[in-house]
């Protein structure tokens, strides 16, 4: 698998065509991705208009730390740094992976760091809520709850959540077959939304 930006499409079509004409058995794939741009400019190495990943991740971590320190928190300074790092790096990765890879992506800090909508901080918050519920369950049932009982899905949101969970395997397979990690990101976002509705109403 060759992964490049969209500008290399013709090159790989020609290379693969030549190899086929030569009788070379091919098990090759070119996976291309669209360009990422800032709101006011496109990244260009030739023009020197690039931001190094290290600089981008440092800025993301700083912005996450600002958000953490503005909220009322009982975290120690070390915990704040750990959370800021996880949220910052997650925000940058998710902002990239949640997009259709073959589209033009405009990166904005507002969207990447948003606590609402399809963003890493939103998903990380949902994960923290789910983990909190599981922690309380483990406190109450340290050996596990071995009582067997039929599971009755009485609320519509319970059924929607259960059906969505059953789609996980198909989503992973579709993402792998099509080289589209955004399918999995979309699945996770929909799951977080369903869980939030379930948490609030059931």
Task: Show which residues each predicted segment covers.
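Non-catalytic interaction-recognition regions
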Residues: 1-202
């Amino acid at each position: 698998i060759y992964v490049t930006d969209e500008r290399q499409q013709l090159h790989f079509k020609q290379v693969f065509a030549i190899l086929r004409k030569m009788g070379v058995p091919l098990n090759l794939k070119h996976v291309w991705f669209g360009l990422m741009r800032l709101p006011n400019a496109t990244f260009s190495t030739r023009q020197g208009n690039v931001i190094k990943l290290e600089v981008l991740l440092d800025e993301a971590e700083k912005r996450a730390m600002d958000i953490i320190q503005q909220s009322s928190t009982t975290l120690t300074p070390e915990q704040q740094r750990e959370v800021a790092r996880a949220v910052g790096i997650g925000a940058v990765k998710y902002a990239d992976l949640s997009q259709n890879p073959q589209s033009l992506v405009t990166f904005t800090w507002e969207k990447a760091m948003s606590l609402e909508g399809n963003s890493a901080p939103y998903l990380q918050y949902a994960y923290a809520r789910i983990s909190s519920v599981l922690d309380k369950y483990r406190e109450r049932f340290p050996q596990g709850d071995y009582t067997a009982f039929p599971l009755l899905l009485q609320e519509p949101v319970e059924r929607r959540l259960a059906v969505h969970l059953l789609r996980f395997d198909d989503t992973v397979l579709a993402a792998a077959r099509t080289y589209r990690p955004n399918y999995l990101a979309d699945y996770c976002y929909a799951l977080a939304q369903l869980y939030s509705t379930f948490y609030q109403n059931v």
